[in-house]
Swiss-Prot record:
This is High-affinity zinc uptake system protein ZnuA. GO terms for cellular component: periplasmic space. Residues 1-31 form the signal peptide. GO terms for biological process: zinc ion transport. It comes from Buchnera aphidicola subsp. Schizaphis graminum (strain Sg). Gene3D superfamilies: Nitrogenase molybdenum iron protein domain. It holds the Pfam family ZnuA. Keywords: Disulfide bond, Ion transport, Metal-binding, Periplasm, Signal, Transport, Zinc, Zinc transport.
């Protein structure tokens, strides 16, 4: 049997079984706003404070690319009122299929006009390149050009996302207009103050040299005026050859880096081996805010914590 036909039959059977399960299960209280990226949940929680629930799947500490939807996750999707998506193929395949299957209302951030103009082409962040205009002419362009999809690391995009969520809630729950408006106003004030504080705090480290793994922090770095000396596209794993490890070490020493930033899910002991015998420090950068709870001030706390992770490492030397 053709493999495509087999997969199609499996999907039909999968959703048919789920449909039966949902009919039999009680309609308990589930989140009204749902997303798969925790920092988007932070933004939603700020606007939905005392209005409605916000929930994030996958569970805390699990990366989206390594997570498979569970039946209970699909129940959450079924009972949610709104789904916040980034779009452009970044969400898990079956998550989007489930959202479409249950005909849920969605906010696709990359389709929002004011956000489209803030999207950055990956080449924008390379030194010596001519600055590209932040415009997207049509859907085809966003599908064919590689854009940085870690939108929540941009305070500007976060603000536009908050406005969209505000408008969505206002349309759905006009009786809670006072609270929803108050939440957006509070978010704007807190974000503005936080941005000023962070820009002031990073002044002392702006000229410090550092490396990151993967080009995932560019929105944040660009906004706050930080400039990495370079990035390593591939994080060394357990099976990585010694030659590549020494190549990384030589690059760090050549560029006189004083810090290398990694993500919590990486094997830190490999970096310890690379920087052994040098003055180079290492530090975690948590772009998902795994230890931050979903509360009204989560997003600004996330920005502060991320900036402090930069500062704590770069101020050591």
């Amino acid at each position: 049997m053709n493999i495509n036909i087999m997969l199609k039959n499996k999907k039909k059977k999968f959703f048919s079984i789920l449909a039966i399960l949902f009919i039999l299960m009680p309609n308990n209280s589930y989140a009204s706003i749902l997303t798969v990226f925790k920092p988007l949940g932070f933004i939603a929680a700020a606007i939905a404070h005392n209005v409605t629930n916000v929930e994030v799947i996958p569970p805390n500490g699990t990366t989206v690319e390594n997570y498979y939807l569970l039946p209970f996750d699909l129940i959450k999707i079924k009972h949610s009122d709104f789904i916040i998506l980034i779009g452009d193929q970044i969400e898990p395949f079956f998550f989007k299929k489930a959202v479409k299957y249950f005909k849920k209302k969605t906010i696709v951030l990359t389709k929002i006009k004011n956000i489209k103009f803030l999207l950055k082409h990956k080449s924008n962040f390379k030194k010596g390149k001519k600055k590209q205009k932040n415009t997207l002419q049509n859907k085809k362009e966003i599908n064919n050009i590689s854009y940085d999809m870690y939108l929540w690391l941009s305070p500007q995009i976060a603000l536009e996302s908050a406005i969209v969520i505000h408008d969505m809630l206002l349309k759905s729950m006009p009786q809670k207009k006072i609270t929803i408006d108050k939440n957006l106003k509070y978010f704007k004030l807190c974000l503005s103050k936080t941005n000023k504080d962070i820009k002031k705090n990073v002044l002392s480290i702006k000229e410090k040299k550092y490396f990151t793994f993967h080009n995932t922090y560019k929105y944040f770095e660009k906004f706050y005026g930080l400039h990495p000396s370079g990035q390593f596209k591939t994080y060394p794993g357990i099976k990585t050859g010694v030659q590549y490890l020494y190549k990384i070490k030589n690059e760090l020493l050549k560029k006189q880096a004083i810090c290398v930033f990694i993500e919590p899910q990486f094997h830190a002991n490999i970096i310890d081996f690379i920087i052994q015998g040098t003055n180079i420090q290492k530090e975690n950068l948590d772009l998902f805010g795994t230890a931050i709870p979903l509360v009204q001030d989560s997003y600004v706390n996330f920005l502060v914590k991320l900036s402090n992770q930069y500062i704590s490492c770069l101020k050591k030397i």
